Regions:
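Conserved catalytic-core motifs of eukaryotic protein kinase domains, centered on the activation segment
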Residues: 37-39, 64-70, 130
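Conserved hydrolase catalytic core segment
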Residues: 91-130
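Conserved HGGG/HGGXW glycine-rich cap/lid loop of the alpha/beta-hydrolase fold
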Residues: 11, 17-63
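N-terminal cap/lid segment of alpha/beta-hydrolase-fold proteins
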Residues: 1-12
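Short, well-ordered coil/turn elements that cap or connect secondary structure elements
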Residues: 10, 48-50, 90, 113-114
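Active-site loop/oxyanion-hole signature of alpha/beta-hydrolase fold enzymes
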Residues: 55-96
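Glycine-rich, phosphate-binding/catalytic loops in enzymes
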Residues: 41-46, 70-72, 112-113
Length: 131
């Protein structure tokens, strides 16, 4: 797995980055899940293999750090993910977001604007303010 060091707090978010020449897909998992555990089989599907596939473990999940002093709000997740997108130089990408990842994906898409070419939500809470 790769590591992204979050500038604001020096915590480490871990992720898989599978190569592909088509539009990158950023997978944002839900509560009780982790990209490293729940999405490798999905990312291996023939229909997706041409895409660059980025499977993250949000802070507090999977192999990423689990800091006690992090608030775990949608906004705080979006803050470091926006930096992550910038660090990876994702000029154009797709967001796939599940469950709690949904409001995170919605807010990240708002912040990234035209960089996000599609937003796919699965079993998502559509109101970020309610999380």
């Amino acid at each position: 797995m790769k590591e992204y060091i979050i500038a604001q707090n020096q915590n480490i978010m871990r992720y898989h980055d599978f190569p592909g020449k088509e539009t990158p897909i950023l997978f944002i998992h839900g509560l009780g899940c982790a990209g490293s555990f729940d999405y490798p089989e999905v990312a291996a599907q023939a229909e997706l293999v041409g895409h660059r596939r980025i499977l993250i473990d949000l802070l507090g999940s999977g192999f990423s750090d689990k800091p006690d002093d992090f608030s775990y709000t949608v906004k705080d997740h979006v803050d470091y993910l926006y930096g992550f997108v910038y660090e990876l130089n994702l000029q154009s990408f797709i967001i796939f977001a599940h469950s709690l990842g949904g409001p995170i994906g919605i807010e990240l898409a708002k912040r990234c604007g035209d960089q996000v070419t599609a937003l796919v939500l699965s079993e998502s809470n559509l109101d970020p303010s309610s999380v």
